[in-house]
Amino acid sequence: MAGNAYSDEVLGATNWLKEKSNQEVFSFVFKNENVQLNGKDIGWNSYKKELQEDELKSLQRGAETTWDQSEDMEWETTVDEMTKKQVFIFDSLVKKCLFEVLNTKNIFPGDVNWFVQHEWGKDQGWHCHVLIGGKDFSQAQGKWWRRQLNVYWSRWLVTACNVQLTPAERIKLREIAEDNEWVTLLTYKHKQTKKDYTKCVLFGNMIAYYFLTKKKISTSPPRDGGYFLSSDSGWKTNFLKEGERHLVSKLYTDDMRPETVETTVTTAQETKRGRIQTKKEVSIKTTLKELVHKRVTSPEDWMMMQPDSYIEMMAQPGGENLLKNTLEICTLTLARTKTAFDLILEKAETSKLTNFSLPDTRTCRIFAFHGWNYVKVCHAICCVLNRQGGKRNTVLFHGPASTGKSIIAQAIAQAVGNVGCYNAANVNFPFNDCTNKNLIWVEEAGNFGQQVNQFKAICSGQTIRIDQKGKGSKQIEPTPVIMTTNENITVVRIGCEERPEHTQPIRDRMLNIHLTHTLPGDFGLVDKNEWPMICAWLVKNGYQSTMASYCAKWGKVPDWSENWAEPKVPTPINLLGSARSPFTTPKSTPLSQNYALTPLASDLEDLALEPWSTPNTPVAGTAETQNTGEAGSKACQDGQLSPTWSEIEEDLRACFGAEPLKKDFSEPLNLD
């Protein structure tokens, strides 16, 4: 910037603003409103009474001098004298209010930076902007300053009012000015407390960017917005003409512009968040994320898996409610984002699928005892657990005692984790524990009675609202139901009357699994890892848990009278060390089947099959051997399970073809 390019006044004002650019100051607005008292109109220009105090007269003369010196002689102003006089009086009254408050605080005026500008707005009319600040000012004093200035401003306005008012009317005018806050302070509303706090502005920036850019009013009455006159504590902008003011603003803007402008991109989520999170909120969110990740669904699980966070929340004020609400958010997140099938599948150890044998699982053995296609039954159950069964949203295990109903249901519920239990003893609120769950378990269901309609809605996967004890009603989203019973739940009795109209609707909502085969006493429980492995096996072998996949595999949607035995399960072969399908032919040896021929030893080695005979096995073909064939078969079954002769023959034909086998089988048996 060349030194002789601009006047000393312009450069002085620019440098002065740059020195004060980072000083924080209060921003006040002085105004008045049109008032009517007992038919007497008091407007913005009703305060032209001659001032009597010498200090006020001196301030008024200073305002007149500022107007004259800052007036641009290139065009003639048309602002009338009455408007000018009113502005001069307002200027003296505003400065008088400022000086009186400074005296109250024992602050020397020379230690304060201030700026005053009188303006006219299209909507607001006359108003005066005041910036004031210094080393003895703090943000907490802003509201106190506003109250004091409001009191002095109302008092001096009443003194300067040239309308003939009675003493009572003067008091009323002052009350109106104080109650309506004719002096306002720039504030902001805190997002958390919702309270107003003082908003400080930067002294130099506010003047250069806002006040100096406005146009001067040159007509009376004013047609457009603009400023009348301005003054400051440094006497730097008092006598600047409109063009010089704009030049100061431009020079200040150019000098204060940063060399590099850094841009930041704010995402919509950050804008929405918008507030500062407390440490407590951050801690709760972190804990909640860990609980969801570890699938914690009960206080007991929390105590065992995350004891530190549990103790931390328990020690806080209102810790019990905090624990309860946090756990409720966790279960709600799981219920809305995962299905019961998803929670089961994620527990599967996929590395063990290579050696996993589906027929060996206790669940499939129970189904196989009935001659069922256990793959088909498990596939149907998984579709319901994945909320893909449509209206048939309930898996019903029913039949006599000790047939395996509860152990299968218990294994599924344990694998899901987030399970709600129906409480038949709580007559008024039986579903109190069933909200925000991935699975509803109804153990030993009985007569539905008065609750039949509510049961039908939940069993069909509808969204309904239920009553809770001590709370308002709550919504249950579509949730799979698993149910066990020894009774015929399709027969509904209300009092002593049977209601047959409910029978078919109940059947339409159930996946009917009727177990009748009594299990031996040493059968044992279903392993906790069994159902995750079953689900993983089904997915790996193309049995997706969707009704479309089920229909593609088995032909149609299952109904109440579904025949689980059709189609038959293909008989697995070459499963060393695994049990055979219970509904295939009994285990046998060549002795029990009276075969005259046996494969060559080299063939057995090629097939990696262990021979069924031992050195103590009687020789085939003798009378002793024929009489003890049954005992030999039983001994073989009691020992390590071996392939049947029919299976070996089938494998040999697959490996060597029919012609070589025909030749081998035609040779006489040589047992030497």
Curated annotation (Swiss-Prot):
Region ranges (DNA-binding): 1-276
KW NADP (keyword) present: no
Leading EC class: hydrolase
Subcellular location: Host nucleus
Region annotation Disordered: where it falls in the sequence: 613-643
Manner of cofactor binding, per the entry note: The endonuclease active site can probably bind other divalent cations.
Domain PV NS1-Nuc stretches: 21-259
Keywords: ATP-binding, Covalent protein-DNA linkage, DNA replication, DNA-binding, Endonuclease, G1/S host cell cycle checkpoint dysregulation by virus, Helicase, Host G2/M cell cycle arrest by virus, Host nucleus, Host-virus interaction, Hydrolase, Magnesium, Metal-binding, Modulation of host cell apoptosis by virus, Modulation of host cell cycle by virus, Nuclease, Nucleotide-binding, Transcription, Transcription regulation, Viral DNA replication, Viral genome packaging, Viral release from host cell
Biased composition (Polar residues): 613-630
Transactivation as annotated region, ranges: 543-672
Domain (SF3 helicase): residue spans on this chain: 373-528
Region of interest (Ori-binding), ranges: 191-195
Record-listed E.C. numbers: 3.1.21.-, 3.6.4.12
Recorded family membership: Belongs to the parvoviruses initiator protein NS1 family.
Function: Multifunctional protein which displays endonuclease and helicase activities required for initiating and directing viral DNA replication. Also plays a role in viral packaging and transactivation of several promoters. Binds site-specifically to 2-3 approximate tandem copies of the tetranucleotide 5'TGGT3' within the origins of replication (Ori), unwinds this hairpin region and nicks one DNA strand thereby initiating the rolling circle replication (RCR). Cooperatively binds Ori with host PIF and probably other host factors, which activate the nickase function of NS1.
Protein name listed in UniProt: Initiator protein NS1
